[in-house]
From Swiss-Prot:
<dbReference type="GO" id="GO:0042147">
    <property type="term" value="P:retrograde transport, endosome to Golgi"/>
</dbReference>
<dbReference type="Pfam" id="PF00957">
    <property type="entry name" value="Synaptobrevin"/>
</dbReference>
<comment type="subunit">
    <text>Interacts with POPDC1 (via the C-terminus cytoplasmic tail). Interacts with BCAP31; involved in VAMP3 export from the endoplasmic reticulum. Interacts with BAIAP3; this interaction is increased in the presence of calcium. Interacts with PICALM.</text>
</comment>
<feature type="topological domain" description="Vesicular">
    <location>
        <begin position="99"/>
        <end position="100"/>
    </location>
</feature>
<dbReference type="GO" id="GO:0043005">
    <property type="term" value="C:neuron projection"/>
</dbReference>
<feature type="cross-link" description="Glycyl lysine isopeptide (Lys-Gly) (interchain with G-Cter in ubiquitin)">
    <location>
        <position position="77"/>
    </location>
</feature>
<dbReference type="GO" id="GO:0001921">
    <property type="term" value="P:positive regulation of receptor recycling"/>
</dbReference>
<feature type="domain" description="v-SNARE coiled-coil homology">
    <location>
        <begin position="14"/>
        <end position="74"/>
    </location>
</feature>
<comment type="function">
    <text>SNARE involved in vesicular transport from the late endosomes to the trans-Golgi network.</text>
</comment>
<keyword id="KW-1017">Isopeptide bond</keyword>
<protein>
    <recommendedName>
        <fullName>Vesicle-associated membrane protein 3</fullName>
    </recommendedName>
</protein>
<feature type="cross-link" description="Glycyl lysine isopeptide (Lys-Gly) (interchain with G-Cter in ubiquitin)">
    <location>
        <position position="68"/>
    </location>
</feature>
<keyword id="KW-1133">Transmembrane helix</keyword>
<keyword id="KW-0770">Synapse</keyword>
<keyword id="KW-0832">Ubl conjugation</keyword>
<feature type="topological domain" description="Cytoplasmic">
    <location>
        <begin position="2"/>
        <end position="77"/>
    </location>
</feature>
<keyword id="KW-0967">Endosome</keyword>
Length: 100
């Protein structure tokens, strides 16, 4: 029965090795959980920034469309003024030629 006392120290050693491995895995898992939580926080911040950027882009698009329309009308007015001046000039020339 000498196997009883010698088996106990070997068994304790294996149990201690297993416990050390379990502790190591637990530490690794804690680090992994912390990394996942950090990643989640960063993703949340990135999502918020993306939403803000989308809102800014929509506002820019609206402002650009209004500005485009404003300058289109301004261009139309300039063409109308130019055509009116040209017509008045042509009428003056016609009246001057006819009256001469």
């Amino acid at each position: 029965m000498s196997t009883g006392p010698t088996a106990a120290p070997g068994s304790n050693r294996r149990l201690q090795q297993t416990q050390n491995q379990v502790d190591e895995v637990v530490d690794i898992m804690r680090v992994n959980v912390d990394k996942v939580l950090e990643r989640d926080q960063k993703l949340s911040e990135l999502d918020d920034r993306a939403d803000a950027l989308q809102a800014g882009a929509s506002q820019f698009e609206t402002s650009a469309a209004k500005l485009k329309r404003k300058y289109w009308w301004k261009n139309c007015k300039m063409w109308a003024i130019g055509i009116t001046v040209l017509l008045i000039f042509i009428i003056i020339i016609i009246v001057w030629v006819v009256s001469s």
